């Protein structure tokens, strides 16, 4: 399967290291992005380049997209000079963006008319796991197609799990993003309490991380907050997008997400304060502002 030609569209914080891991695994890659510096970097790593999604579709067996939101994926897949214009029957699109489940289904249906199969395969783990090739991938779509391209996805991931039909991958990602957002908020709330009460938050973190309150989120984000390092592994702006998709989906299926709605308001307040491009660990800043403290070691 490594003789297949792979297209990769979207070389941002996540897409760039993911594409590099595919090259390291021996895949032949054709890339596209709006940033010429990133394109130059990938060319130096051994990739080829194409100027449009259509051009990539004309020469590739499978295309991976890693883009910010539903409209971007729709434009690349179905728009002018998009994948659909260059696609031949048998092409497979693996969309690893985090988008609305309904959008995944709509794009898939449109591509199917051209004989193109689609998997929705969003990822979790942020930039560090994208670099290490240890992302968690949650995949919706045809199981036989999933099986055929499992090794390709595994070259970028620690785990790759099929969760159901098209759209199921993004429903799973929304569940993931709800848990992550609420965990960061809970951590921020707890460390604000400790700081305001005059207890060293780093010692609190060290004391609780091995118990039931310990989590991947706590270990990843508490040190960032205490070091005042809000360089984005995952931006607040993007998490707002995910929570908006979660709330929209919940309204459509009749589920209630009161805690998600509360954290969404916190994130929107942070964006209004100019922190939209900060890492989502900056949720702590919302609590710090209210309590008039700073969580530091």
Q: Where in the sequence are the language-model features?
A:
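NAD(P)+-binding Rossmann beta1-loop-alpha1 motif at the extreme N-terminus of oxidoreductases
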Residues: 1-66, 91, 96, 295
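Beta-strand segments within the central parallel beta-sheet cores of soluble alpha/beta enzyme folds
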Residues: 202-209, 261-265
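Rossmann-fold dinucleotide-binding core
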Residues: 11, 99-177
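Hydrophobic beta-strand scaffold residues
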Residues: 29, 49, 117-119, 160, ...
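Rossmann-fold NAD(P) dinucleotide-binding segment
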Residues: 53-65, 69-117
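Interdomain hinge/lid region at the active-site interface
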Residues: 166, 170, 214-281, 286-287
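Active-site-proximal catalytic alpha-helix in oxidoreductases
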Residues: 132-140, 161, 165-197, 206-220, ...
